[in-house]
């Protein structure tokens, strides 16, 4: 009998040590994600991957905390301490619904930022429906928002010589500024900014060895001049279906290629962000930063571009802020960042399925 008790006690001891090691590992990884935004991925790209895991690691630690509390284990302190700093960051991913916003006392500005995915979503998801139908649906939605400024990424047109006439037809009363990369067959893709405000200045920031870029436009509204950066930073360029096929076929080359693409993207993106940030620093007027960052709110990209700015979702959003449709609600990679002295009074991420991204719509009090 005594021997059985000793064996049982030994089993519990091993289980207790194993569970504490698991808690320490999960807590340690979560703590590293807090520092991921401070480390330039160009120098240590692995930190960026851990930043992507902030939400899953937070959930793992929460489950471990509840499990430890249920077992009346003193080890609950481990996940609890790891989770405490997350209270400062979780609002970047989800916001508790609040009462109606305080009415604006000053003039407002409405901005839409939307990665339209080259208008190819219908072709991928609904056979028989093409780019034209997808584009018409997207522009109908944008017109319904009645925005002052529209920032589009991955805009595509089949004839580069017809860009202005096409946009005039879709968005009457708006002036378009754009930079497009030509592709074989006469088509082109890139960034487009549309506005009905008086244009004061414009420019572009091209990134080395990349088909991504940022364009900027200066406007004046209600006696205030400001700049809008429309950014599309380096993407991972990976295919989830391709990864799954490689997994089922046990094809190691797929994973090797995916890893190379991720590393290339992660190391290029901070350089692009630094280029834009340098331009912002020299800008004589206050700046909005909009677009597809291809990075999460625990990233170096977000942390860098947030300096001197506020996040429209954090200030006025409700529910989950995720913008990448296929991994909802995990990935929030599209943003509208506004100058500190302005105020976001509305933020919306309509879940419309015209792209693999959802649009971001914000109303700003100037």
Where are these regions (language model features)?
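Acidic/histidine-rich helix-loop elements
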Residues: 113-133, 237-265
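Structured beta-strand-rich core segments of catalytic domains in phosphoester-bond hydrolases
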Residues: 33, 80-108, 139, 149-241, ...
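Active-site beta-strand/loop signature of hydrolases that rely on acidic residues for catalysis
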Residues: 110-116, 134-163, 194, 217, ...
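N-terminal post-signal-peptidase region of extra-cytosolic proteins
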Residues: 131-137, 176-179, 202-204, 212-214, ...
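Metal-dependent phosphoester-hydrolase catalytic domains
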Residues: 4, 15-30, 35-70, 74-80, ...
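Extracytoplasmic/periplasmic, Sec-exported soluble proteins
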Residues: 130, 134, 155, 182, ...
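N-terminal, active-site-proximal structural segment of metallo-dependent hydrolase catalytic domains
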Residues: 2-166, 182-186, 273, 366
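Short, solvent-exposed loop/turn segments at secondary-structure junctions
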Residues: 116-119, 157, 197-200, 233-236, ...
């Amino acid at each position: 009998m005594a021997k059985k008790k000793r064996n049982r006690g030994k089993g519990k001891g091993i289980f207790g040590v194993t569970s504490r090691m698991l808690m320490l590992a999960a807590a340690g990884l979560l703590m590293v994600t807090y520092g991921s935004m401070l480390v330039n991925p160009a120098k240590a790209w692995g930190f960026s991957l851990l930043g992507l895991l902030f939400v899953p690691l937070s959930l793992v630690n929460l489950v471990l905390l509840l499990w430890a509390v249920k077992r009346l284990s003193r080890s609950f302190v481990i996940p609890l301490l790891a989770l405490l700093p997350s209270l400062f960051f979780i609002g970047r991913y989800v916001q508790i619904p609040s009462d109606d916003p305080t009415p604006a006392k000053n003039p407002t500005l409405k901005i839409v930022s939307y990665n339209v995915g080259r208008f190819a979503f219908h072709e991928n998801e609904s056979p028989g429906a093409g780019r034209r139908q997808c584009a018409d649906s997207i522009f109908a939605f944008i017109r319904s928002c009645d925005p002052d400024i529209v920032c589009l990424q991955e805009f595509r047109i089949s004839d580069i010589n017809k860009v202005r006439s096409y946009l005039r037809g879709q968005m009457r009363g708006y002036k378009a500024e754009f930079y497009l990369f030509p592709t074989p067959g006469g088509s082109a893709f890139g960034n487009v900014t549309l506005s009905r405000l008086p244009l004061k200045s414009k420019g572009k920031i091209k990134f080395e060895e990349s088909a991504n870029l940022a364009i900027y436009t200066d406007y004046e509204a209600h006696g205030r001049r400001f700049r809008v950066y429309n950014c599309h930073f380096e993407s991972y360029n990976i295919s989830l279906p391709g990864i799954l096929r490689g997994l089922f076929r046990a094809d190691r080359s797929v994973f090797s290629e995916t890893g190379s693409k991720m590393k290339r993207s992660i190391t290029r993106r901070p350089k692009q962000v630094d280029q834009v940030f340098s331009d912002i620093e020299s800008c004589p007027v206050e700046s909005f930063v909009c677009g597809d960052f291809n990075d999460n709110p625990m990233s170096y990209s977000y942390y860098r571009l947030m300096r001197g700015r506020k996040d429209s979702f954090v200030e006025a959003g409700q529910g989950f802020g995720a913008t990448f449709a296929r991994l909802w609600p995990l990935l929030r990679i599209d943003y509208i960042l506004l100058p500190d002295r302005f105020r976001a009074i509305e933020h919306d991420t309509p879940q419309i399925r015209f792209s693999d991204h959802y649009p971001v719509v914000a109303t700003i009090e100037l």
